[in-house]
Regions:
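Acidic, polar-rich low-complexity tracts and alpha-helical solenoid repeat scaffolds
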Residues: 4-7, 25-271
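Bacterial N-terminal signal peptides that target proteins for export
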Residues: 2-15
Length: 271
């Protein structure tokens, strides 16, 4: 009986101590860090396979483990792209802002400005798809206006950029969407005889979205508001503009071959 008890004590001690020793040995073993290039090459393979979720993991690992490494800045620019293609518009926008802040003279800086606007362009697409179906007089379109402003800034800064044609095509849509939205709201106020509010919306289109397809519609709303408010001289001025320009007031932009919410974007250049 004593031998059995002794056996159980020894066996129990072995069961407890041996795993602890193994764990202790493992914890002391050096962790082999993967080389930076391995992470980068892995990210490239994953993006090529459209596995953007996993590519993001590899690129984020470069940022975290090699912040001053050879591929750090390139990984930052490619994170903008990977987030966007993975449908993470907010993360893509933030990554672009970060890149602009940290690398103002980088060869890919134009790409960061471009993608910042593109991310704003697509993140509110749910609102855009509803734009002609519901009363938008109280609907916020700040996202569309932000994208318009960011893409306009990109074209001002980098008119010769390889991404300029892409930005110009999207501005066509944004200009039309914002103008239509403002005039839907203007007509909403007009029907309710809120002429000052309607006038403000229509004038926004004339002043901020010139040469859009909605210019004539905006002028007619302004004329109606002036008439209702008793501003007859101003009304006559608007009538003269309408009469002189007539059918010449059209959208000056060429039609785009891009679909409105195409989830595609160019990758940054390799540097």
């Amino acid at each position: 009986m004593m031998q059995i008890k002794k056996y159980f004590k020894i066996n129990l001690a072995t069961t407890i101590i041996v795993p602890l020793l193994i764990t202790s040995c493992n914890s002391d073993a050096p962790v082999m860090e993967r080389p930076e290039k391995v992470y980068y090459d892995t990210a490239q393979r994953r993006m090529k396979a459209n596995n953007f979720y996993s590519a993001i993991e590899s690129l984020e690992a470069i940022e975290a483990r090699y912040p001053f490494g050879r591929y750090a800045e390139q990984a930052q620019s490619e994170l903008i792209y990977a987030y966007y293609m993975n449908g993470e518009d907010e993360a893509s926008h933030e990554a672009a802002e970060k890149f602009i802040r940290l690398n103002p003279r980088h060869p890919n800086i134009d790409y960061a400005y471009f993608m910042r606007g593109i991310a704003s362009y697509t993140r509110d697409k749910g609102m855009f798809t509803r734009i002609f179906k519901f009363d938008l007089s109280n609907r916020d379109i700040s996202g569309a206006k932000q994208a318009f402003g960011e893409l306009s800034e990109f074209l001002t800064r980098f008119p010769q950029s390889q991404y300029a044609p892409y930005a110009s095509q999207r501005l066509i849509y944004l200009r039309s969407l914002i103008a239509k939205n403002e005039l839907v709201a203007a007509e909403y106020y007009l029907k309710r005889k809120a002429y000052v509010a309607a006038l403000r919306r229509a004038k926004y289109v004339i002043e901020n979205i010139p040469n859009s397809s909605e210019t004539m519609r905006a002028l007619k709303i302004i004329r109606e508001c002036y008439q209702a408010l008793g501003y007859f001289e101003l009304m006559e001025d608007i009538e003269s503009v309408i009469e002189v320009n007539g059918g010449s007031i059209i959208d000056s932009s060429e039609p785009s071959s891009w679909s409105l919410f195409s989830r595609k974007a160019p990758q940054p250049n390799k540097n």
